[in-house]
Design a protein with these regions (language model features):
Chain A
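Alpha-helical interface subdomain recognition
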Residues: 1-75, 170-320
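FAD-binding core of flavoproteins
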Residues: 77-185, 310-320
Length: 320, 381
């Protein structure tokens, strides 16, 4: 057991965090929502110059792989408006032909930021029929889907994309963990500052209760993301491991966002507040390819098929 | 960043499972029963583990330990809990009384107490809680009044687990009125349970025998030789003890075992039961990882309330979730114990005991308070 990220990985992530802060942090997401051209004009150069999109998040090089997932986490912390996880989900061997991977469940009508990635493919959450994705125009904003782009799934691609579900799930989990870390920190800081009835609201039991639940959820997701990433790098992550992480990601987001809003009261609902933006912009990450119920059903199917690793492993079931 | 516990730790897990399979009787339901034969099993297990130098693997070599890695130690705790704590009440001596005596004890106290603990031959109980001092432990008031070169103890402790079978009590008493901080004036005494003036009264509880008791001190005499640490500064010792206890029992280990058994039941492959079951599997993995984080932080000397208490919160809530899942899955067939080698045969016992998971060793409200305080102070400093 070694729970430390390498110094190199941490440094690269810190450089990216500084660069993102220089672009305004969450303000960049706000600006991009108002004018989607901001994504390519302002964020793309930073992602290019730091080399984030070329990293192998699951390779043997611990510095590089660690830097990649910490970079994803840093982007998630400010809900940076770029499909970073979709790009990094492409295995390096496939990058000559594929620019981005979207994991889908059925035939999606929209995908986020699909206009930014030329040669994108759609990989089914269960199955291996890979399609090309064609973006039909630019983003048509919806409050909970700010960069939704209408898409059509076209011709079947010959080669499958190995490990797509695991890679995409792990990267989305790091992204979400970054966002939830931001919300938890904001809420804890606000609880200490905001006074009502002559005391900081952090002194009220109900507020402490919420902050503690947020910490358990956010910290748990951090741990499970790193654990599943480690399994994936060793080639030992099963689809059940990936879907377990997915269930945990959706759960953690629900706990953190619901309690986070409650701690802030009315102010957290305002668009000028980062919480509102993080909440809205995170939603597509949580709902694609599938919502919580469906994800749990998919997990159950995988546990039945392959079992589940634990101190006392769950055996596969004979499913006729 | 990697999460393997290491070959040695995994080899130890295999060895412990083999050993327990050999030593535990077919219908092993844990050591907390009235039946003397059952308790004899715990004694045999402890002494066998002691002979194989497994009982105190995490102690330093100079006190009979094997200097095991923190992960081997974790594996030992996981396997013991998963198998219904076959060490019985001895586990307290091993996990915190021994280490606390190493840290604060005189040479004489170490010589007297450490070998019997390491040999699995002694049961300790913890005399901290009082009727008026529960979560607010610092307000404890059991009196120790000066009497020549010693003190006379008078007052009551409560909830004292295993007191009826304990040989020694690790007792917190008040030797002076609090000055400034209310935790000032507390002293720790190591008191033999057969000392005149010490009486135990078992409390009938839904948890079963031995778990909850009252402990009365009626003029029991203690001397300087019984004091652990410094007079009036016992709070230092208590903090050390609570520090050892704070990562808590690896409850997720038994929950993992119960979930694996549940997954073999008819109906576990689908429906609402199947969905709840896989969600619990996710929660069990999360609880284990949060616990590993706390263990790693403690090993590195950087453990804070945030890591310790988030791990506790996840584990104790998991315990209740899995206990309810098990009893509900079994339905009316699970209400009475059915015995057998499977944990599921003891689902009702596990369910009853799980009611205390969020109360014992610091309630979940106190854990939440600690986490929230840690986070808000991180954000304001
Ligand atoms: C199975 C079991 C075994 C035990 N074994 C031992 C033992 O061996 N030795 C020993 O000394 N003790 C033992 N205890 C006692 C245990 O440490 C106490 O039960 C625990 O500290 C809580 O104290 P209490 O039960 O008096 O509850 P109280 O402190 O009275 O709490 C009642 C309720 O009020 C809440 N509350 C209290 N203060 C606050 C606050 N500031 N903010 C918000 N909520 C609050 C609590 O969380 C709880 O929900 C045991 C308990 C159990 C259940």
């Amino acid at each position: 057991m070694n729970r430390a990220w390498t110094a190199t990985a941490q440094e690269m992530a810190a450089t990216l965090r500084t660069a993102l802060a220089g672009l305004g942090g969450v303000d960049l997401a706000r600006a991009a929502e108002a004018d989607p051209a901001v994504r390519a004009a302002r964020l793309a150069p930073v992602l290019d110059s730091t080399g984030v999109l070329d990293l192998d998040a699951f390779g043997a090089d611990g510095d590089e792989a660690g830097a990649a997932v910490l970079a994803v986490r840093a982007c998630g912390a400010v809900v940076a408006p770029w499909p970073v996880t979709r790009v990094l989900a492409v295995p390096p061997a496939a990058r000559a032909e594929v620019d981005a991977v979207f994991v889908v469940d059925g035939t999606p009508t929209h995908l986020d930021h699909a206009d930014l990635v030329g040669r994108a493919v759609a990989v089914p959450v269960a199955g291996d029929r890979v399609h090309r994705v064609r973006a039909l125009g630019g983003p048509k904003r919806a409050p909970l889907d700010p960069f939704r782009v209408a898409v059509a799934l076209e011709s079947l691609v010959a080669a499958p994309v190995p490990g797509a579900l695991t890679r995409a799930t792990v990267l989305d989990a790091f992204w979400t963990a970054g966002a939830l870390g931001s919300v938890t920190r904001l809420a804890a800081g606000y609880a200490a500052d905001r006074r009502q009835f002559g005391r900081p609201i952090a002194s009220f039991g109900e507020i402490r209760w919420r902050i503690a639940d947020m910490a358990v959820a956010a910290d748990g997701l951090d741990e499970l993301s790193a654990y599943t990433w480690d399994l994936a790098r060793r080639g030992r992550a099963t689809p059940a491991d990936a879907l377990a992480l997915r269930v945990a990601t959706q759960d953690a987001a629900d706990v953190v966002l619901r309690n986070g809003h409650q701690v802030f009261g009315a102010i957290g609902l305002c668009e000028e507040h980062d919480l509102a933006v993080i909440d809205r912009h995170l939603t597509p990450v949580l709902l694609r390819p599938a919502g919580a119920q469906r994800t749990t059903e998919l997990l159950l199917a995988e546990v039945n098929r392959h079992g589940f690793d634990a101190l006392f492993p769950v055996a596969p079931r004979d499913v006729g | 960043m990697e999460f393997e516990l290491g070959e040695q730790a995994e080899a130890l897990r295999t060895r412990l499972r083999e050993l327990l399979a050999e030593m535990l009787p077919e219908n092993w339901a844990g050591p907390f029963s009235d039946d003397e034969r059952v308790r004899a099993v715990a004694d045999r297990v402890c002494q066998r583990l002691a002979r194989e130098r497994l009982l105190t693997i995490d102690w330093p070599a100079e006190y009979g330990g094997a200097g095991a890695s923190v992960w081997e130690q974790t594996v030992l705790r996981e396997e013991m809990w998963a198998h219904l704590e076959p060490r019985g009440a001895q586990y307290m001596g091993l996990s915190w009384v021994g280490p606390t005596i190493m840290r604060f004890g005189t040479e004489e106290q170490r010589r007297e107490h450490l070998p019997p603990i390491a040999g699995g031959r002694v049961v300790w109980c913890q005399g901290f809680s009082e009727p008026e001092a529960g979560s607010d432990l610092g307000s404890l008031s059991l009196g120790a009044t000066r009497d020549g070169d010693g003190w006379l103890l008078s007052g009551q402790k409560i909830w004292t687990s295993y007191a009826p079978i304990a040989d020694w009590c690790f007792l917190a008493a008040r030797t002076a009125r609090a000055e400034g901080a209310k935790t000032h004036g507390v002293t720790i005494f190591l008191v033999p349970m057969d000392r005149p003036g010490v009486t135990v009264r078992p409390i009938d509880s839904m948890l079963g025998v031995l778990h909850l008791n009252e402990l009365y001190f009626d003029g029991a005499r203690v001397t300087g030789a019984d004091v652990l640490g410094t007079v009036d500064h016992g709070w230092e010792v208590i903090k050390f003890v609570l520090g050892h206890e704070r990562i808590g029992i690896p409850r997720y280990a038994r929950d993992d075992r119960l979930l694996a058994e549940l997954s073999g039941l008819d109906g576990a492959g689908g429906g609402a039961f199947g969905l709840e079951l896989v969600r619990a599997l996710v929660h069990a993995r999360l609880a284990r990882l949060l616990s590993y984080r706390a263990v790693a932080r403690r090993e590195a000397g950087t453990l804070t309330d945030r890591e310790a208490s988030t791990a506790r919160m996840a584990a104790i809530q998991l315990d209740q979730e899995v206990a309810s899942l098990a009893l509900n899955a079994l339905g009316p067939n699970g209400i009475a114990p059915s015995g057998g080698g499977e944990l599921l045969g003891h689902a009702e016992d596990i369910y009853r005991y799980a009611r205390s998971a969020t109360i014992a060793s610091g309630t979940i409200e106190i854990q939440r308070m600690l986490v929230a305080r840690a986070l808000t102070s991180e954000e304001t400093t």
